């Protein structure tokens, strides 16, 4: 199955299995390189899917207008401070 045909969840699970195998350090060099390349492809695919999902998520602003979701604003709201402010 190609990377594009896999669901995000399956791609992420495969990426986790690759990371475990590479971290164990007991794979032959050639297999390790192949796993690394596959993993990098999965990372790119997952990032692209996450970005597409982020763009689809929107929130209603105070004036009722739809505004893009901003992770920094969400994290700041959970931390109790304005976005961009470090505590």
Curated annotation (Swiss-Prot):
<dbReference type="InterPro" id="IPR003761">
    <property type="entry name" value="Exonuc_VII_S"/>
</dbReference>
<keyword id="KW-0378">Hydrolase</keyword>
<keyword id="KW-0540">Nuclease</keyword>
<dbReference type="InterPro" id="IPR037004">
    <property type="entry name" value="Exonuc_VII_ssu_sf"/>
</dbReference>
<comment type="subunit">
    <text>Heterooligomer composed of large and small subunits.</text>
</comment>
<keyword id="KW-0963">Cytoplasm</keyword>
<comment type="function">
    <text>Bidirectionally degrades single-stranded DNA into large acid-insoluble oligonucleotides, which are then degraded further into small acid-soluble oligonucleotides.</text>
</comment>
<dbReference type="GO" id="GO:0009318">
    <property type="term" value="C:exodeoxyribonuclease VII complex"/>
</dbReference>
<protein>
    <recommendedName>
        <fullName>Exodeoxyribonuclease 7 small subunit</fullName>
        <ecNumber>3.1.11.6</ecNumber>
    </recommendedName>
</protein>
<dbReference type="GO" id="GO:0006308">
    <property type="term" value="P:DNA catabolic process"/>
</dbReference>
<dbReference type="GO" id="GO:0008855">
    <property type="term" value="F:exodeoxyribonuclease VII activity"/>
</dbReference>
<dbReference type="GO" id="GO:0005829">
    <property type="term" value="C:cytosol"/>
</dbReference>
<comment type="similarity">
    <text>Belongs to the XseB family.</text>
</comment>
<dbReference type="Pfam" id="PF02609">
    <property type="entry name" value="Exonuc_VII_S"/>
</dbReference>
<keyword id="KW-0269">Exonuclease</keyword>
